[in-house]
């Protein structure tokens, strides 16, 4: 092989390594948020531990990410946390938890990390998105969920704050959201054009009214059936990134998946995303290069019927997060020493030895 061809081969190898390092050099902060007071079912506070036990940190490290594990946050129960309006449960406790999480997410994003928040229930998204917006005020949100979580404290049929975080986030709804205890620190940080829903299939009447009358973009499971997930993602990016690149916050509720895939969750709804659809969403978000923060919420190990259901749900959560950071279904070969830019050929001596053995 000539000196020139050796040089070209070495140069190609170096270019491949540089491209790979650029692609896989995510600095990822993982924040555990073991919180359950945004809803009534016990066990979702064990979600972070279940996802960690399924190998999240190792998976991200193997993808070439520099992982900074911030551990689990501590959330205090506010004493005498009375109902608001005779229905909204634990407002002070939820408000305080979201404030604590917002501060931690802001710190992580401000330090240059892509932030992964492990829930916990989905009320936490108010905190994670608020904290993210403190560092990236032009962010946009992709909300993957069976539910819209956009009730207000005055429309909620359950009183559970995990069904209300988006109403607190949107500027257009602030004249409909009363100043409830625990949220005096909070300010809306999104406009209606900054969010797109994917996977909806269980809406309350007030939520249907809000989505329609405030012209908020969403793609229900029917839309996905009719259009296909590829078209849904194209339209999502057209809206959120069509005019400019900006940071993406992905808030992913595990109940977006069909319960056959993710049984260990508190509000399962039949007819959800397939594995392929869910992972396609996160693969495409990764491919934009604009992902800045991820929530993975509502994994509840206590509600699983068997240990296998816990494992299946937690493993699915890990796959969702890993595909946000470059895991592909073709296989993720991320280490520089595994790059192959040319296939090996047999040496002359090897061929001669084989010929000699045949003659013998």
Curated annotation (Swiss-Prot):
Q: What keyword terms does UniProt attach to this protein?
A: Arginine metabolism, Hydrolase, Manganese, Metal-binding, Urea cycle
As to how many cofactors bind and how, the note says: Binds 2 manganese ions per subunit.
Q: Which SUPFAM superfamilies does the protein's record reference?
A: Arginase/deacetylase
Q: What class of enzyme is it?
A: hydrolase
The family database entries (PROSITE patterns) matched by this protein are listed as:
ARGINASE_1, ARGINASE_2
Q: Where does Mn(2+) 2 bind?
A: 145, 147, 253, 255
One annotated GO molecular function is: arginase activity
Which reaction equations make up its catalytic activity?
L-arginine + H2O = urea + L-ornithine
Q: GO terms for CC? A: cytoplasm; mitochondrion
Query: Which GO biological process annotations does it have?
Result: arginine catabolic process to ornithine; urea cycle
Q: What induces it?
A: By thyroid hormone (T3).
Record keyword Manganese present = yes
InterPro entries for the chain: Arginase, Ureohydrolase, Ureohydrolase_dom_sf, Ureohydrolase_Mn_BS
Q: In which pathway does it act?
A: Nitrogen metabolism; urea cycle; L-ornithine and urea from L-arginine: step 1/1
- Tissues/organs with expression: Expressed at differing tadpole stages in tail, intestine, hindlimb and trunk region. Most abundant in tadpole tail.
Role according to the record = As well as its role in the urea cycle, may be involved in tissue remodeling.
Family designation: Belongs to the arginase family.
Name of the protein in its database record: Arginase, non-hepatic 1
Q: What is the lineage of its organism?
A: Eukaryota, Metazoa, Chordata, Craniata, Vertebrata
Its gene is: arg2-a
């Amino acid at each position: 092989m000539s000196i020139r061809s050796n040089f070209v081969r070495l140069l190609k190898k170096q270019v491949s390594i540089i491209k790979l390092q650029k692609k896989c050099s995510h600095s990822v902060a993982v924040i555990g948020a073991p919180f359950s007071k945004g809803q009534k079912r016990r066990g979702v506070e064990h979600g972070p531990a279940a996802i960690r036990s399924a190998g999240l940190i190792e998976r991200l490290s193997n993808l070439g990410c520099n992982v900074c594990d911030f551990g689990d946050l501590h959330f205090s129960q506010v004493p005498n946390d009375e109902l608001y309006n005779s229905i909204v449960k634990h407002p002070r406790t939820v408000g305080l938890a979201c404030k604590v999480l917002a501060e931690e997410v802001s710190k992580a994003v401000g330090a240059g990390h892509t932030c992964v928040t492990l829930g916990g229930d989905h009320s936490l998204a108010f905190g994670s998105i608020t904290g993210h917006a403190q560092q990236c005020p032009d962010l946009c949100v992709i909300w993957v969920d069976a539910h819209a979580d956009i009730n207000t404290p005055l429309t909620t049929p359950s009183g559970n704050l995990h069904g209300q975080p988006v109403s607190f986030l949107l500027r257009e709804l602030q004249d409909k959201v009363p100043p409830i205890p625990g949220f005096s620190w909070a300010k809306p940080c999104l406009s209606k054009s900054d969010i797109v829903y994917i996977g909806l299939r269980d809406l309350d009447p007030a939520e249907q009214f809000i989505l329609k009358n405030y012209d908020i973009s969403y793609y229900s499971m029917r839309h996905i059936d009719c259009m296909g997930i590829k078209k849904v993602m194209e339209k999502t990016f057209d809206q959120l990134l069509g005019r400019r690149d900006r940071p993406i916050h992905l808030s992913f509720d595990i109940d977006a998946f069909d319960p056959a895939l993710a049984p260990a969750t508190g509000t399962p709804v039949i007819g959800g995303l397939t594995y392929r659809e869910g992972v396609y969403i996160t693969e495409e978000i990764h491919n934009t290069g604009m992902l800045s923060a991820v929530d993975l919420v509502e994994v509840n190990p206590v509600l699983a019927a068997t240990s296998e259901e816990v494992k299946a749900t937690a493993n699915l959560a890990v796959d969702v997060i890993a595909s946000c950071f470059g895991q592909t279904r073709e296989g993720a070969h991320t280490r520089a020493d595994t790059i192959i830019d040319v296939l090996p050929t047999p040496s002359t001596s090897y061929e001669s030895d084989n010929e000699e053995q045949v003659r013998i």
